[in-house]
Amino acid sequence: MSKEYLFTSESVSEGHPDKVADQVSDGVLDAILATDPQARVACETLVSTGLVVISGEITTTAHPNYREIAQEVIRRIGYDNSDIGFDYKSCAVLAAINRQSADIAQGVNEGEGLDLDQGAGDQGLMFGYACNETPSLIPLPIYYAHRIMQRQSELRKDGRLNWLRPDAKSQLTVRYVDGKPVAIDTVVVSTQHSPEVSHAQITELVIEEIIKPVLPSALMQGEVRYLINPTGRFVIGGPHGDCGLTGRKIIVDTYGGAAHHGGGAFSGKDPSKVDRSAAYAGRWVAKNIVAAGLADRCEVQVAYAIGVARPVSMMIETFGTGRITDEKIVELVQRHFDLRPKAIIQELNLLRPIYGKTAAYGHFGRDEPEFTWEATDKAAALRADAGL
């Protein structure tokens, strides 16, 4: 008997207040890494009506202009007029920055601390995931939820739908049969808009110009329910409508709820923080396992102790889809991947100003060259070593 269920994932636009905060934090990180690749950065941002607050622990030889960084990020997003609730030209930017704790630095710096290798920047557990539902080996609901939001941004910025404003959310419910996506059940889009456009106009144009051009027609053969701005009005939005904070969209950033999450956010953190670098490495490992044909679905967990280089544990789960045992896959991963922080940073070339692009529309399932953790460069070797 087949198993049928509905699964839902959501995405948010670059103008969502939490994503504004993420982009400011990663904007600071990129500005620092551009001149000081060895900097230690843990940057948190709060955005509210007319206000940006940047805080955290940063040790660097760079001299970032926090106000200019924040204003440029906000301008690029599209908050350029107080009429839409936020204006990069007039918002206040406050910065309260400390240096990284010397006790933490001792455990992370290579050649210091009890472990002379570069240790993990903190304890914690991280997950990576991949599946063969889409060409990018990312779950289908989150993949298309992101595409809807990217389409909203595209039509807003090029003026084709000039009543759109930056803040928006999407949600996609997909029907699965025996673990495979077979139909789209419900699409929810809430988008900020100018006050003169009617709800009927918004509904028609969002469905016809944003949703339908993005979603695969093969999954839309049945009756699809559309819920467009279901409150009826969304004029007040962005940081004026809701306070935004760095790290509040960790499920949007990853796999849309289709996989576990260790709890650590990404944005504003340099790659010595395993919350970020090890989660990227976990995705790299899982994607190569699926690309190699070792499994249809794969979840990888790694865990670290602060100041210790090697992971304290690694677990792989293939949900009954593996061509070989999960234990055998663990052995293959241990032979083909070095998951010490320094090795991850070197292998994935993470000491570069590449993080701004990650801060909206997902850290995974992307094809831009900066997303080195999306490479399937180990797949052939894994498959050969597995004897497949």
UniProtKB/Swiss-Prot annotation:
Mg(2+) binds at residue 18. One of its GO terms (biological process) is S-adenosylmethionine biosynthetic process. It catalyses: L-methionine + ATP + H2O = S-adenosyl-L-methionine + phosphate + diphosphate. L-methionine binds at residues 57, 100, 242, 273. One of its GO terms (molecular function) is ATP binding. K(+) binds at residue 44. It is an enzyme of class 2 (transferase). Keywords: ATP-binding, Cytoplasm, Magnesium, Metal-binding, Nucleotide-binding, One-carbon metabolism, Potassium, Transferase. It comes from the Bacteria. ATP binds at residues 16, 167-169, 233-234, 242, 248-249, 265, 269. It is found in: Cytoplasm. Its main location: cytoplasm. Residues 100-110 are annotated as: Flexible loop. Its EC number is 2.5.1.6. Pfam families: S-AdoMet_synt_C, S-AdoMet_synt_M, S-AdoMet_synt_N. Pathway: Amino-acid biosynthesis; S-adenosyl-L-methionine biosynthesis; S-adenosyl-L-methionine from L-methionine: step 1/1. Its cofactor is Mg(2+); K(+). InterPro entries: ADOMET_SYNTHASE_CS (IPR022631), S-AdoMet_synt_C (IPR022630), S-AdoMet_synt_central (IPR022629), S-AdoMet_synt_N (IPR022628), S-AdoMet_synthetase (IPR002133), S-AdoMet_synthetase_sfam (IPR022636). Binds 2 divalent ions per subunit. Binds 1 potassium ion per subunit. Homotetramer; dimer of dimers. Belongs to the AdoMet synthase family. This is S-adenosylmethionine synthase. The lineage of its organism: Bacteria, Pseudomonadati, Pseudomonadota, Betaproteobacteria, Rhodocyclales.
